Amino acid sequence: MTNIRKSHPLMKIINNSFIDLPAPSNISSWWNFGSLLGICLALQILTGLFLAMHYTSDTMTAFNSVTHICRDVNYGWVLRYLHANGASMFFICLYLHIGRGLYYGSYMYKETWNIGIILLFTVMATAFMGYVLPWGQMSFWGATVITNLLSAIPYIGTDLVEWIWGGFSVDKATLTRFFAFHFLLPFIISAMVMVHLLFLHETGSNNPTGIPSNMDMIPFHPYYTIKDILGLLIMMTALLALVLFSPDALGDPDNYMPANPLNTPPHIKPEWYFLFAYAILRSIPNKLGGVLALVLSILVLVIIPFLHTSKQRSMTFRPLSQCLFWLLAADLLTLTWIGGQPVEHPYIIIGQLASILYFSIIIILMPLAGLVENHLMKW
């Protein structure tokens, strides 16, 4: 008799994706972040669902409903902080996952990579809309500033912004539609994750050497299920430590003040995981130029497979590219720091230099390093 997991139509799909899936025998812990992202998504949907049961998307009551969740709902504060800090964990895993893809040349699987970029944009949009929902000062002004960027689009900009707002300013209509989309998008993300996995399983996983591993595969279960559980334990330990000991460490104190359209906070800034893009936006004095740079800072990932000049896929044996990669990582940390600083000397010039370096490394220096390394191999 055939094992049910191999014969049942539904179990067969699960079996071929998570149990009997042939995986390279040498993939490192950098390959753990895919499963961690799946767990983060499940956690966000679950905590978000319970929060939505108590939240009201009305400008008069939104702030108070969040306070009510923290004070009066059983373990409401745990739900709220798990959801808020879970988003931070989500983005940490997301950025490390993309970094892994860049380092080991996983972007050569173009379909998987491109779906991943669309996923990144969707997750960023979802997180932005979620940040608006508590209706604190930073929620309101963040929504005003970021949606206002669309007014830089020639001809249709102003109409587009007012259409998104549902009026002439960020108000009740904006909050209601942001809540609706914030609730809907995670389910769309879940569907896109399945497409992401579908494309990945067409080609199989990459590995640290960048060399095809078809002749040396091992079953996903038990080897990588155990490995993923270890990653999960480490991540959950970090998340719970954050939630239970300093839940507001990554938040903005201004968001504990109810939204007031008549009082602008001294420094309007997004959550920490958007600061690098915000720094790039601010580094260009022109509004439209800044918006284009902001979009291109993420969209530049699309052209990376076409800028791959090296004969080797992975950076494991390419010291010059490795130096540039870690310079890029340091540059992104610098941009994140700059994004949280006020717009004054010397932060302005540091931000501008870091922004130029960011695009230069990706578009010019990395392809050049690949060509140089090809020549070095001939020697």
Swiss-Prot record:
One function term, GO molecular function aspect: ubiquinol-cytochrome-c reductase activity
Keywords for this protein: Electron transport, Heme, Iron, Membrane, Metal-binding, Mitochondrion, Mitochondrion inner membrane, Respiratory chain, Transmembrane, Transmembrane helix, Transport, Ubiquinone
Gene Ontology biological process terms in this record: mitochondrial electron transport, ubiquinol to cytochrome c
Keyword Heme: yes
Subcellular location: Mitochondrion inner membrane
Membrane topology note: Multi-pass membrane protein
Segments crossing the lipid bilayer: 33-53, 77-98, 113-133, 178-198, 226-246, 288-308, 320-340, 347-367
Chain positions recorded as a ubiquinone binding sites: H201
UniProt cofactor note: Binds 2 heme b groups non-covalently.
A matching Pfam family: Cytochrome_B
Residue sites binding heme b b562 per the record: H83, H182
InterPro entries: Cyt_b/b6_C (IPR005798), Cyt_b/b6_C_sf (IPR036150), Cyt_b/b6_N (IPR005797), Cytb/b6-like_sf (IPR027387), Cytochrome_b (IPR030689), Cytochrome_b_C_euk/bac (IPR048260), Cytochrome_b_N_euk/bac (IPR048259), Di-haem_cyt_TM (IPR016174)
Cofactor section: heme b
Sites where the protein binds heme b b566: H97, H196
Subunit structure: The cytochrome bc1 complex contains 11 subunits: 3 respiratory subunits (MT-CYB, CYC1 and UQCRFS1), 2 core proteins (UQCRC1 and UQCRC2) and 6 low-molecular weight proteins (UQCRH/QCR6, UQCRB/QCR7, UQCRQ/QCR8, UQCR10/QCR9, UQCR11/QCR10 and a cleavage product of UQCRFS1). This cytochrome bc1 complex then forms a dimer.
Miscellaneous information on this protein: Heme 1 (or BL or b562) is low-potential and absorbs at about 562 nm, and heme 2 (or BH or b566) is high-potential and absorbs at about 566 nm.
Protein name: Cytochrome b
